[in-house]
């Protein structure tokens, strides 16, 4: 990673602002603090964020840390992760993020998460075990290809063993053994 100034600080600010707003909304959703109108507003925000990221990808490819800095690159990744309504966009974003990883312009862990999200959104088994379902009484791993070798695959992308990741998520989202009495929610960033 680099500490030099980003080439496009304007894009960095926009990505960070959008991801921050979306994260605040998502935190309320996980705690079941939103009514139907607010849930709809969140979906609208995700759609608008997807369109902004789509424009950025078309103009610049993946907005990695050279273009926008590490914080904004993480924001772009977060926005992409929540583009569930557009599986084709998720796949395209994962491809561009993969190229950025190869150019040392983005973390490989971000690619693994986005790759898994693109797979699960397309109703395919994930590779790295990053996609989870938060239920009222438990956390479930979304379907996984070859679960017996997931830790080997996770190691290739600098992710901890699946048992460690699941325990971290359980402590974060189920501190008292329940998940805030919430409906099912897909967790992407935690695993």
Residue positions per predicted region:
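Mature-region segments of soluble proteins
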Residues: 74-186
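Short intrinsically disordered terminal tails
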Residues: 1, 189-191
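N-terminal helix-rich structural modules
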Residues: 1-123
């Amino acid at each position: 990673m680099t500490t030099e100034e980003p080439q496009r600080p304007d894009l960095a600010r926009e990505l960070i602002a959008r991801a921050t707003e979306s994260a605040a909304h998502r935190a309320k959703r996980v705690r079941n603090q939103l009514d139907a109108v607010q849930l709809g507003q969140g979906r609208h925000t995700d759609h608008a964020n997807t369109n902004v990221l789509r424009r950025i990808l078309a103009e610049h490819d993946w907005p990695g840390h050279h273009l926008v800095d590490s914080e904004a690159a993480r924001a772009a990744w977060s926005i992409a992760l929540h583009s569930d309504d557009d599986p084709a966009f998720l796949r395209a974003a994962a491809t561009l993020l993969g190229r950025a990883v190869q150019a040392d312009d983005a973390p490989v862990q971000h690619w693994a998460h986005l790759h898994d999200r693109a797979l699960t959104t397309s109703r395919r088994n994930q590779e790295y075990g990053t996609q989870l379902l938060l239920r009222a009484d438990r956390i479930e791993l979304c379907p996984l290809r070859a679960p017996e070798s997931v830790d080997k695959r996770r190691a290739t992308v600098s992710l901890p063993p699946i048992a460690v990741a699941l325990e971290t998520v359980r402590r974060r989202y189920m501190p008292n053994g329940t998940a805030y009495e919430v409906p099912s929610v897909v967790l992407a960033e935690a695993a």
